[in-house]
Amino acid sequence: MYAGDWLTRLTDLARDARNPRQWHVPSNVWGLGVTSMLTDVSSEMVLSILPAYLVMTGGLAPLALGVAAGVHEGGPMLAAWAGGLMADRSGRRKLTAGSGYALSAICRLGWFALSGRTITAIAGLVLVDRMGKALRTAPRDAIISLSVRPDQLATAFGVHRALDAAGAALGPILAFVLLWRMPGRYDVIFFASFVVAVLGVVALALLVEETPEPAAADADRIRLSSRDVFAAFGDAAVRPVLILATAFALVTISDAFVYLLLVQRSHAGAQWIPLLYTGTSVAFLALAVPVGYLADRIGGRGVFVFGHLLLLLAYAAAFGGLTVWPWNAVACVALLGGYYACSDGVLAGIASRVLPAATRAVGLAWVATGVSVGRLCSAIVFGVVWTRAGDRIAVTAFTTALVIVLCAAIATRSTGTAVAS
């Protein structure tokens, strides 16, 4: 983009920012944000302690942690398809999303019942919990996208992701406080997590309304078939978004590995790992809404690619020469928070712009599947390389691959072959 184009866009951005209408967000977005916030409080109370618990207490090798992290990220991808397809075929997106939230709440009760049992049983519950997340994600994002104007998509997703991040920040803090006051009482954390998850389901029922659709969307939904769903993969508008998202996902390092290596190389205690999750979520919370607003004004693709530049800098802070604790940790979590702000909600906004209303949940599921497959593969491969060749070679290989994908994304943008922003 030429400098004059950027100057024009920044001028328009400054003018639009003074318009209160640009910042109005519908109640559905707030309702889903509250639901996600409560659900993430519940989820992160448990999940934030698992990396250190599995490796240091459970004695798992890095390869096993890679498999666990990969399944956590990408294992439930079929559930995402089921959620998207059911939501688009029935038009009952709230009910479909609600079933995913309810499944996760049931898993919290399962964690309480299995307190003190085998790691395998707990890992199985993590998988089912992530299936609940996968089931609800596409219909939830479809509700958000259908509740706002097209020029508010990234802003709306930014508001939702900010509330989601607030929950992700509070969950580890609550777990830390409970263990500090009641050492070893993991059963208390599991039960408290279940109670908060139930409150999330109640919030969805009371605060979120089903999104109305135009008659054209109803007609398209009646004709929607499995063949149409898979044909969306070849859609000229959807495919570049899917390729871009999947390519970056394939070269990312799971947060579990980032935090684990960060504390090991800094000779810090494992008790800091939950607070690293919290720090990342706080940074995400602070940046999600303004970054979403910026993406709506200047285009989402550039913001998305810039987020992965921040990810590269986060890796430099975690794995590079800066080992002065806690400043390396502060830099790492701040940059990771910026990365998530530029990628998570922004990617959903990019995809929503090119997807028709009748198949939006399925289309978003396509993108989520690409990201899940990429993260599944990257986590397993990183674990394999670490186990067989050492963590330094694994980090070097993945950061080099990230640089290559970044250069390719910038090059395709400059030649005009990139996805529309």
Please place each PLM-identified region on the residue numbering.
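Intracellular juxtamembrane helix-capping segments at the cytosolic ends
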Residues: L135-V148, C342-L355
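Juxtamembrane intracellular "pre-TM" segments in multi-pass secondary transporters
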Residues: Y2-P26, E210-L244
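Cytoplasmic membrane-interface "Motif A"-like loop-to-helix N-cap segments
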Residues: R89-Y101, R297-L309
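C-terminal ends and interior cores of transmembrane alpha-helices
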Residues: A102-R117, L309-T323
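Transmembrane alpha-helix termini and helix-breaking/packing motifs in multi-pass membrane transporters
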Residues: A52-T57, L170-F190, C377-I393
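C-terminal membrane-cytosol helix-exit motif in multi-pass small-molecule transporters
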Residues: V195-A216, V405-R413
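Helix-loop boundary and gating motifs at the non-cytosolic
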Residues: D16-G74, V238-L276
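Helix-to-loop junctions at the C-terminal end of transmembrane segments
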Residues: A79-R92, L179, L287-G300, W386-T387
